[in-house]
């Protein structure tokens, strides 16, 4: 991806995530990419980094093949959805939404 992701200014840039595309649907910015690692590792990193950047965690859920972390901060809210890539437990699909609160 050539341009920086459309995320809040203080939103953490997860070291293990490669961002591949972004789009806007109405008021919602969507950023996608992948994490080199399993869903649990991705979930733990995302949650810890968001909390460390002073974002509020509204909800989080970790299951065997997917995870969600809903957040708010800096006048925005959204969700980081993590899904195991089909047939590859060492690569996790990342889907981040963010919109005005």
Question: Model-found features: residue ranges?
Answer:
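An acidic-aromatic pocket/loop used at catalytic or ligand-binding sites
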Residues: 1-101
